């Protein structure tokens, strides 16, 4: 870790230790969902997951293999990983095969990550929410394994990643989480549960972590049906795959897009099937 990395981590830890005890632990606002202490705990959770991946990246990323590069990328940010590898393919088209595998593995880790997030913030609903999400995650695992079997490229150094403990990134996530949980509660109160699917469609382009945490918390508080909760999380995850495929095309190459889209297409089809057919 560089001196700047250490400073960023220490700054975030110190600020969190100072801020958390003084933040009010009560909800306020029109829909009583904006709890300052809870919002900052969500920031700490997401930064902690990303930081674990970032520290591992600093320790092993220089010579990371394909699987490790994908796992670390998914822990830090699967979207940022997609952007980084798409840009690398733009400079070196021959890296398309390697980049596609890493992007799909990172997205698979992101699929598992939402289950962990639900377990962390709303364990009471995990038994009802996890099965369809686990089923979809296993499909993503299958796609990752399939791509690994057909790709013999060795991994190389991972692109430089942003430290998730940077205060700016943490504050942005906190703001996005607060906005999404407020929008979700407002949509539910004014328009009913069906409106949450529209929130999921938009959130998938912005931040899957935020919609996952906010929906899980609302479901645990019995303000959102548990079935609606996992459907919203899955829809946001599927939209995020569409977004990453678009990134692969616009920032990378047609070859990268085709490779990524072949895996994501199966995953999206499977996800839609789960949405429609899950009992």
Language-model regions, residue ranges each:
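Membrane-water interface at loop-to-transmembrane-helix junctions
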Residues: 2-13, 32-42, 155-184
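Entry/N-cap segments of selected transmembrane alpha helices
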Residues: 30-49, 127-136, 168-176, 254-269
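Membrane-interface helix termini and inter-helical loops of multi-pass transporters
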Residues: 25-36, 118-127, 156-157, 188-190
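C-terminal transmembrane helix pair
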Residues: 112-116, 130, 224-279
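C-terminal ends of transmembrane helices
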Residues: 1, 52-61, 82-92, 145-157, ...
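Hydrophobic core segments of alpha-helical transmembrane domains in multi-pass membrane transport
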Residues: 12-23, 43-51, 136-145, 173-182, ...
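Membrane-interfacial helix-loop connectors
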Residues: 75-77, 83-93, 101-111, 119-123, ...
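Hydrophobic alpha-helical transmembrane segments in multi-pass integral membrane proteins
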Residues: 16-28, 112-120, 178-186, 213-220, ...
């Amino acid at each position: 870790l560089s001196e700047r990395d250490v400073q960023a981590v220490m700054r975030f830890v110190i600020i969190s230790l100072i801020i958390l005890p003084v933040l009010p632990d009560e909800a306020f606002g029109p829909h009583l969902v904006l709890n300052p202490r809870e919002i900052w705990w969500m920031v700490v959770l997401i930064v902690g997951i990303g930081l674990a991946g970032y520290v591992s990246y600093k320790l092993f990323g220089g010579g990371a293999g394909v699987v490790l590069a994908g796992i670390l990328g998914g822990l830090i940010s699967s979207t940022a990983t997609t952007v980084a590898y798409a840009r690398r393919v733009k400079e070196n088209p021959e890296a398309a095969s390697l980049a596609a595998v890493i992007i799909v593995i990172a997205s698979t880790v992101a699929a598992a990550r939402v289950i962990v997030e639900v377990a962390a913030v709303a364990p009471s609903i995990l038994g009802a929410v996890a099965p369809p999400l686990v089923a979809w995650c296993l499909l993503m695992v299958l796609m990752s394994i399939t791509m690994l079997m057909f790709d013999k490229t060795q991994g190389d150094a991972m692109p430089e990643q942003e430290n998730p403990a940077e205060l700016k990134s943490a504050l942005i996530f906190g703001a996005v989480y607060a906005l999404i949980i407020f929008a979700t509660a407002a949509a539910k109160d004014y328009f009913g549960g069906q409106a949450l699917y529209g929130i999921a469609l938009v959130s998938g382009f912005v931040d899957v972590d935020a919609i996952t945490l906010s929906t899980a918390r609302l479901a645990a508080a019995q303000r959102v049906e548990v079935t609606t909760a996992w459907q919203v999380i899955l829809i946001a995850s599927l939209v995020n795959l569409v977004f990453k495929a678009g990134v692969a095309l616009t920032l990378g190459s047609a070859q990268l897009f085709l490779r990524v889209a072949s895996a994501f297409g199966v995953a999206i089809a499977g996800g839609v099937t789960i949405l429609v057919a899950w009992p």
